[in-house]
Amino acid sequence: MDLKNYIATIEDYPQEGVTFRDISPLMANGNAYSYAIREIVQYATDKKIDMIVGPEARGFIVGCPVAYELGVGFAPVRKPGKLPREVIEAHYEKEYGIDTLTMHADAIKPGQRVLIVDDLLATGGTVKATIEMIERLGGIVAGCAFLIELDGLDGRQAIEGYDTKVLMNFPG
């Protein structure tokens, strides 16, 4: 199945000069959504995953069904102030400054094998901050899986050395 047929392209969103890749049509099509989830599950099957971690918000949309299919837990990564218990945080650079991500301080147990799942790999800032928090908690990042990679934005270089699965590539 060519999943690219289920990605909408919106020019100049969220700001002028940016091309936004919208996964909503993929999620709206049961066959395409199921196919994408199965592809990530297949990638994860031999990795002995204990936990899925997904950054908000689209990492939840992709990561939760993967966790369900694998029979493992899901740990959310969120912006500050969105998680109710003790958190750890990591900072990363965005185009116009520094941003922060958090996760519960007890989300990952030492030695747990973790798969990070998100919709998009662009510059790699979000996933790099997520890796930092997982490793700080003693987890082992067994892999990273994305629906889309935007080529030319150096996301792969940011997470060099980590096994990575991407279902589709688009120009960045």
Swiss-Prot record:
Keyword Transferase attached: yes
CDD domains for the chain: PRTases_typeI
GO CC, one annotated term: cytoplasm
Keywords linked to the UniProt accession: Cytoplasm, Glycosyltransferase, Purine salvage, Transferase
Single annotated GO MF: adenine binding
Subcellular location: Cytoplasm
Pfam families in UniProt: Pribosyltran
Pathway of action: Purine metabolism; AMP biosynthesis via salvage pathway; AMP from adenine: step 1/1
Protein name: Adenine phosphoribosyltransferase
Organism: Streptococcus mutans serotype c (strain ATCC 700610 / UA159)
Gene: apt
